[in-house]
Amino acid sequence: MNANIKDQATNISSMSGFPSGEAGYELGVSACYAGFIGDYLIVAGGCNFPEPGKKKYYSGVYAAKVTGKEEALTWEMIGNLPEPAAYGGVVSTGDSLVLVGGCNTEHSLKTVLSIHLDQEKGTPILNVLPELPCTVDNMGVCLLETRLFVVGGNQDGCASASLLSLELGKEKEWTVENNLPENPRVQPVCAAYQGELFIWGGFYENGKSSVVPTTGLRYDLTTKSWTTLPAPRNLQGSELTLTGATAMLVVSSEGEARIVCAGGVNREIFWDAISGTYSMVAKADYLKKDISWYKFNDCFLTFNLKTGQWDIPFPENSLLARAGAQVALKGETLYYVGGELKPGLRSPGIVKVTP
């Protein structure tokens, strides 16, 4: 792990203004859909706990114009998804966002939608794309040119190691690629570049045999083969998991390609809970600890696709310590939307990062 720390962290800042068109949404959500359509940051769906122990899913579609200079965002609710949804995936392509799968209180989803804006009315236009071969939620999604990938997650209600792909605009059915090696991965992150797919994070809940991986996987689309990628490490040298984190491919104006990652759970604390061990805290008290106890990842991490090495360009920052956030990219600037600060507590914050 290289640590090329910049002297000051003005590159990371919190913006004010969060959507509030539905009762409870203003408390912040996690696992929403978000991305840019032109100059508009679009946020849709997500979930939270407006009342303790009662998860609520949302259907609103919100838009805020972003110039890059503002410190606050002004939101307008411009429409609704066909039903409340969260824990799906989203990619940006041209003047549209593609929303993939997800779930709500009633069921998990097979649906794949594209959304773009009516330039005159400012309202969202939804189009239905080929549905998934099974319901999928809590997966990773990414785009390689025009091929959409869905990695792991819960498929038909079961943790999966499946890899699915669809050529947008050309194919009517999804392709089943070679499975991820070893265990299923729920809540992984992924990105794709020049014929290769990169995956980190995810978890497999299986009692004392539960797994929360730190190392990643690379899938070569030509040879259909898998290789192992190094784990990210924090400034103290400890391996990190990117379970519940975000990942985004960023290509600089000079052509340098990096996968930028932030957030995610603490491996040891999360494993202790999903395995049912509860050696760190009594099960009844797991949701009652202070935010700092959960030790969500507060490092901004970049994986250089040329060197194959991880880097930490900024000091640790508590603004990034969240799980289940969504990330949107405009130019080389990233906007992190919502997420949870600890299990059950969402953030209404939007964090702007300029690498």
Go through each PLM region and give its residues.
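Kelch-like beta-propeller repeat domains
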Residues: M1-P355
